[in-house]
Every structure is written in structure tokens, then in C-alpha cells.
């Protein structure tokens, strides 16, 4: 096990999400004695990434947050929800990643700052043409649990079966379409957005949690609900 003590933790929100929906998760982890902050994103921070553009603006805010939260260079634990998980994999990397703001590329080398990357409902696969640009870069350059000195923990939710047809209801239809765009198989189990198959990585510690939905704000439990956090917080 890589962890020898409780480390600072940083939460990276999912695509097009700000920090606010993660406030309860951040507070709960702090109450558990895990010093935690969320990358201070707003929805507008994501605008430059639309259409499959590089996620450089998000990586910059992630790097700045880690530097502030662990100024002495101590390795932290990184929680990436949804797209935050594969963006975290880019941050770990030691190969050039395009920087749209300067028309060049940057090596983030975040593996030196991260002890555990814990992804929550992250689609580590995609068939969607815009998302594929970034995810293909990640999977081609850093396949699976790529760095042996980083612990990868991938959490999938299993609550909604993808099915289509007006009799199935909008939740099952939405899940079917999302799963199909993600892994090419709509008739799958997942969290309503990410199918189980796509949320796991080869070589990682892969867990599947029953009854968990993708996003905060639902009447059902999501990855950051207190009873669910209790099932994965030991990896921090």
C-alpha cells in the first residue's frame, strides 16, 4: 500500500461542473480527518474546452490547487469525479499535452504530486467524437493504471440498466444513450451516465457499488453521499 499516513486530498469536479455541488463531500471528508479542498471551478472555466478542445484551463486550476493545498510538495490524493478522473490521468503524465492558450504543449508531471488517483464514475472510454480526442490521448499515452508509483482506484456505480423505448421511462432511455456513446453498448448496467465497464481501468483497484447514481442532487445516493463515501474513503 502506498499510503503511510493521511494525506491532503483534492477533489476535481466533473465536466461542466463547478465546485459548489461538491461542498458536502468536501465537508464530510474534512470531518473524517482528511484535509480536503475542491478545485475552485465554475462552469465558465469549461467553456474553452467545448468541442473536444484541450482541457488545459482545468489542468492549470488543478495544479494551482494542489500547490496551495500541499505547498511543501507532499504527495496528495486526487479524487476525480466523472471527467475529473481522466483529466487527472492527464495531469499525472510525463508526455507533452497540447496547451491551446499558448499554441504549444506542456508536460504536467503530476505523478510526483499524487499518491492515489481515485476516480468516481469516470468514463475512461468514449465513442463520442468530441470527447474521444482527449480520452484517446489518455488511453494511448497512459493506458490503464499506468504509473506503478501511483495507486489507481476506480469506483463504478451500478443502479440503472440502459434500455430504450417509451415504456421504459426517461431514466432508462437516458442511460441507454449515454452508455452507448461511452462504450458502444447501451444495454448495460451503470450509474445512469457511465457504464460499469467504462468506469474501471486495467490494473487498478476496481470497485462496483450497488445503488449509486452518477451525480449529486439526486434523491438516490451518489458517489459522494456519506454512506457511499464510507465504502471508499479507506483508500485515501
Which positions does each model-derived feature cover?
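Lipid deacylating catalytic domains
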Residues: 2-236
Amino acid at each position: 500500500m502506498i499510503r503511510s499516513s493521511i494525506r491532503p486530498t483534492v477533489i476535481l469536479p466533473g465536466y461542466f461542473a463547478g465546485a459548489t455541488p461538491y461542498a458536502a463531500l468536501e465537508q464530510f471528508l474534512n470531518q473524517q480527518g482528511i484535509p480536503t479542498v475542491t478545485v475552485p471551478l465554475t462552469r465558465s472555466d469549461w467553456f474553452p474546452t467545448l468541442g473536444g478542445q484541450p482541457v488545459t484551463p482545468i489542468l492549470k486550476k488543478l495544479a494551482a490547487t494542489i500547490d496551495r493545498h500541499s505547498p511543501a510538495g507532499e504527495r496528495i490524493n486526487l479524487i476525480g469525479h466523472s471527467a475529473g478522473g481522466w483529466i487527472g490521468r492527464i495531469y499525472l503524465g510525463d508526455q507533452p499535452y497540447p496547451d491551446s492558450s499558448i499554441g504549444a504543449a506542456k508536460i504536467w508531471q503530476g505523478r510526483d504530486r499524487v499518491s492515489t488517483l481515485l476516480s468516481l464514475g469516470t468514463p475512461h472510454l468514449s465513442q463520442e467524437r468530441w470527447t474521444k480526442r482527449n480520452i484517446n490521448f489518455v488511453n494511448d499515452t497512459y493506458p490503464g493504471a499506468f504509473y506503478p508509483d501511483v495507486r489507481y482506484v476506480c469506483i463504478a456505480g451500478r443502479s440503472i440498466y440502459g434500455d430504450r423505448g417509451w415504456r421504459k421511462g426517461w431514466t432508462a432511455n437516458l442511460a441507454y444513450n449515454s452508455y452507448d456513446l461511452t462504450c458502444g453498448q447501451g444495454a448495460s448496467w451503470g450509474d445512469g451516465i457511465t457504464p460499469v465497464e467504462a468506469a474501471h481501468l486495467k490494473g487498478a483497484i476496481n470497485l462496483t457499488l450497488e445503488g449509486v447514481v452518477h451525480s449529486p442532487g439526486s434523491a438516490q445516493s451518489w458517489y459522494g453521499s456519506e454512506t457511499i463515501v464510507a465504502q471508499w474513503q479507506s483508500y485515501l
